[in-house]
Regions:
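Catalytic-domain carbohydrate-binding cleft regions of carbohydrate-active enzymes
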Residues: 1-284
Length: 286
């Protein structure tokens, strides 16, 4: 049976098309909603906080009174934090900065109970550095997920260049021989956003989403990213998952997290994964 892992997240550029403080206030609203939703809905299992622990500081700067509520959700494994301190452009920062970024992310995670997500998270980096597998392995991390670097399909499953891997899963190797499991967001990191609750819309939605994911996945574990840039929390997701499970008896839909997803992917990996070496440079924007 295929398993659809729906991972809720938001990708938070702290300053982009709006000034920092406007993005900051939108982020506070998102986090307020997330905490309230998780406390009220125990079926809303987990939220991936974009791989950057600085978001904890950003929230508590405005809502220091909510630290205990936030920390409990982190300690319970429901809000997943780290490994980085901040999501970086890997080619604009120095090598030492990339090392310190990981160290600072780990240190801050310890202040919130020590549940540090051991996933090298590069959702929207404009290319990935060749020594990332080496750095991650030194930190005890053996898996990386990323959106760019090996010609992902992008929005609406459109491929503009030849794909460089047989599957969305691959071996990614540094020059020193260090290797991690690499997982590409082959249908981007919004391929499970705004899941419909109503049956007819849900059927139309999942027919396409499942077909797109199966096209690239090497296992029966399918990844659906329930979020996008500055995406609010989908507060009715639990109902949407119940609808999907009723519609597709041959697929198990679960509200998941990267730790559980990767653990199950590793059990089913085929022997013919491609090995991608060094820098991942396709689909970068300079």
């Amino acid at each position: 049976m295929k398993k659809a892992h729906i991972i809720s997240h938001t990708h938070w550029d702290r300053e982009w098309y709006l000034p920092y403080e406007k993005h900051h206030m939108l982020y506070i609203e998102m986090m307020d909603t997330l905490i309230d939703t998780m406390e009220k809905d125990q079926e809303y299992k987990c939220f991936h906080l974009d791989g950057q622990t600085i978001m904890l500081e950003d929230y508590l700067q405005v809502r220091p009174e909510n630290r205990a509520r936030l920390q409990k959700l982190i300690e319970d494994g429901r809000i997943a934090i780290g490994p980085w301190y901040v999501l970086q452009d890997e080619f604009l920062t120095s090598s030492e900065s990339n090392v310190r970024n990981l160290q600072m992310g780990y240190k801050l995670a310890q202040e919130f109970g020590g549940k540090w997500t051991k996933i090298g998270y590069f959702p929207d980096s404009f290319g990935n550095m060749g020594q990332a597998p080496q750095l991650l392995k030194k930190a005890g991390i053996d898996t990386a997920v990323f959106g760019r670097g090996v010609k992902p399909t992008g929005f609406n499953n459109q491929t503009t260049e030849a794909y460089e891997s047989t599957y969305s899963e691959m071996n990614w190797q540094s020059a020193d021989g260090s290797a991690v499991l690499g997982i590409l967001f082959a249908n981007w990191y919004n391929n499970g956003v705004e899941v419909p609750v109503e049956e007819e819309k849900s059927k139309e939605y999942w027919d396409k989403k499942l077909a797109d994911a199966v096209r690239y996945a090497s296992t029966d574990q399918l990844l659906f990213m329930n979020g996008c840039d500055h995406q609010p929390v989908q507060t009715d997701l639990s109902s949407a998952i119940r609808t999907a499970n009723a519609l597709y008896p041959d697929v198990e839909f679960v509200h998941s997290n990267f730790t559980d997803y990767v653990e199950q992917v590793k059990k089913e990996l085929p022997d013919d994964l491609n090995t991608i070496t060094g820098e991942l440079l396709s689909l970068i924007h300079i």
